[in-house]
Amino acid sequence: MYNHQNKNFILKKYSHLINKKFSSFGMKKYPRREEIGGDYCLFKYLYIPGIKAYNLGDYIQTIATRSLIELIDKNAKFHFYNRDSFSLYNKKESICIMQGWFADDYNFLPNERIFPVYIGTHFTKKMQEYFDVLNVDFKDFEIGCRDLSTLDYFNKKGANAYFSRCLTLTLPKREVSAKQNSIFLVNLNHEMSSLLPDFIKKEAIEINQKAIKIKNRNLKNEWQECYKEAQDILEKYASEAKLVITTALHCAAPCIALGIPVILLQEDKVYEDRFSALKGILKPYTFNDLKDNRIDFEPKILDIEFLKEMMIKNLKLTLKKHMFTLNKDEEKELNSIRNKIAHFE
């Protein structure tokens, strides 16, 4: 939590930036799509030099966002920019779907050249405290929240907040194949793995998608290798998996979308809210469930095709709303769609 000294320090250091940094939060009028040429900015991630492993979940979100945009805008053009330095963005004016986790500091805030659409967004407690210190007014702010804690925070702030879930749930369902006969354990710790039934352990292949090692270290282009690794891991799940057991949200959600049976294990209480993106879809098991043999190791494929349809329509109509081209009937439809997304089960 911020103490009194920290609050004064932040206000002194950043108060002159408040208007500029938060100018893109509200429902400012975006150019029509034709005026920005159908340009969309997607997130890439520049990790701290010296770190030798990377979380593919970041790029799985980028892949899902791109896939969804391509469904609703056949003429979309894409470029990539570092998520954590949007305040410095200096490229062509573009729309950015703000699907993701924010953030370690204020530099993620889009400047006037980015037209942010907040769908699938999570704000950390640190950023919520930062907003509180700066007393940000969110009355004109619309946000589609990835999780329930972000939703609760912005509802209390008087924002137009709704539960959008995570866009990784919109990936297209795979074709069924006889080659889909592998069991993947994704980011399970040793204690969890040791408690699995013998028939699972005998067949299982362990994967760590949160710590992928980059083969060719090149700070300028390494994000492209990460992106390709994320594409490859999704293809591996789609073409080979008969069951995925994981502790990772951005493994569970895309695998559910692909039509793979999933078992989600919750490492601790911290993950309970993180997994609220899957509320009504898949309930996570706890460590005690695993220890006490309360897990169904033959889960069914979950049918979320209706939810995908609603999430696709939500993005399409939300873009129209931000461009002020939404008519009254579409406004009613959008509200109905968001309600269906929030209460899907």
PLM region descriptions:
Residues 2-345:
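Active-site anion-handling motifs in enzyme catalytic cores
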